[in-house]
Amino acid sequence: CSSDLCVTNARKILEENNIEVITFHMTGSGGKSMESLIRQGFINASLDVTTTELADEIVGGTLSAGPTRLTAARDKKIPQVVSLGALDMVNFGPKETVPEKFKNRNLYVHNENVTLMRTTKEECEKIALDICNKLNQSTSKVALMIPLKGVSAIAIKGQVFYDEKADEALFSTIRKNIKPNIELIELDYAINDEEFSNALALKLLSYLN
C-alpha cells in the first residue's frame, strides 16, 4: 500500500537504459543495508523513492533505519534523486502492540502483523526538517521530487490516509527550508502514477549522463 509500483516502474526505465539496479525494501534493515553498501562504494547513484523509515525514526515506529538514514549518498558525493514515499505512515506490528499514546490516532490494519499510523501535520513538519537538514549539506547532484497528489497508495484522495493538511505541512516545510543547491521538483501526480516514476528515473539518468 506504499510506493511499490513507483519503484517497479522506475526500475524498468533504468534497466532499459543499461543501468544495473539493486532494489531495497524500506523495512529498517533495508535502509541500513542500502546506506551501508553506498558507504562501502558499491553503489554510484541513488534513487531514494521510499523514505518512510524517517517517519519511523522520528515518530517512534518499528521500522526505523536509525538517525543516519539519508546521509550515505550525501557523504559519498554520489548523485541522488530523493522522494517522499510513504511518509504518510509509521509502522507497527499487530494492532494490540501499538503504544498506548497512539491508540486514538488514525490507524490502518494492513494485515494481522502490520498496523500503519497516519503521520500528523506536526510530525510531517519534523520529518521535512530532517530531510532538509540532511540534503542541504550535499555537494553532489541532488533532486528532491514531490508527488503533490499523494505520497503513498493510501494517501491519495478517497483513501484512508488522505490528509491534505498533513501533506501540505510536509511540502511547505520542505519549500521553506531546502537550499537552492538542491533541485526541488514538484509534480502534480501521486507517487505511483507512471508519469511520476518516469520523471524520477529520467532525472537520475540525466545526472548519470
Residue ranges of each PLM-predicted region?
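A short alpha-helix capping/helix-coil boundary motif
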Residues: K12-E15, L47-T50, N111, V151-I154
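Short helix-loop-beta junction
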Residues: A10-E20, I174-N181
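Short acidic, glycine/serine/threonine-rich loops at helix termini
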Residues: L5-R11, S33-L37, E57-G60, F92-E96, ...
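C-terminal non-catalytic interaction/assembly regions of soluble proteins
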Residues: S64-T68, A72-P79, L84-N209
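A conserved active-site cap/scaffold subdomain adjacent to cofactor or substrate pockets
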Residues: E20-F24, S29-V82
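A broad, low-specificity signal for short, low-complexity segments enriched in glycine/proline
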Residues: C6-V7, G41-N44, F102-Y108
